[in-house]
């Protein structure tokens, strides 16, 4: 019998984060053809199953995971998406790890992002172009000496016979919340650390170029490239 101790609960409210300069976000998704066809956000295949948010400024530290499409334990989808839309409308910096993926999913839901978008994965590539691994776990261990605790997620997935990552949507939110919140809070901590390294290496100009180009790259991904199938064959 599966008896892993669970202490996680979904947030009981929607805090006003409008005064924060930096907000980290991480999406959990159902994306069945990700490995074979790429992000389902572009093809409208799959869905967002939950959104994690984290802030840490001025002595106030908060993180929360809002589940909307898990097997059980979901919050009201419309209310959550309206809250996320409100946050994305703030004129501050939104931080992601692999922003192209998360921002594409938000765009597919009709949620635009105002303000600057920072991608810790891009920052990593600028700081160390010879780096082999760019996963959040790898980066947080190298720069923060912290790794995510995936015990509850992995044990619950094993007990229910599902893949803990690609089939996360099949798990009740209570088994995913802690893991998802850590994704957002560690992304934020990593950003603060990498920002110091960007400063030390004087990489501001090239980072600004990457950041300014990003919205255009997202739009290009959705528009695609016209292909003449007859000539292609």
Predicted features, each with a name:
Residues 1-35, 80:
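N-terminal accessory regions of nucleic-acid-interacting proteins
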Residues 17, 42-45:
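A short catalytic or substrate-binding loop motif that flags glycine-/basic-rich loops and adjacent residues
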Residues 21-25, 47-51, 92, 223-225:
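Structural beta-strand/beta-sheet cores of well-ordered domains, especially the beta-sheet scaffolds
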Residues 25-28, 54-56, 97-98, 223, ...:
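Generic beta-strand/beta-sheet core signal
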Residues 36-42:
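Intrinsically disordered, low-complexity Ser/Thr- and acidic-rich flexible linkers and loops
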Residues 44-199, 209, 217:
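Active-site-proximal helix-loop-helix substrate-binding element of RNase H-like nuclease domains
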Residues 205-233:
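Extended, well-ordered alpha-helical scaffold/bundle regions in very large, multi-domain proteins
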